[in-house]
């Protein structure tokens, strides 16, 4: 049962990956439309990507911990 739980926990890594892809695509479009706002958009994009990546790492660690029990 632990391995099933670990596999389900690792599905949580897919969400942040999709989120980062959408975030990057929309930020690139926004910078293309308004180049003057690029520094602000880039900073917000990096913060959002870091938060999403943190969730992915947390799901990965939970999956590893469940697999090792």
Where are these regions (language model features)?
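Hydrophobic, small-residue-rich transmembrane alpha-helices and their short perimembrane loops
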Residues: 1-69
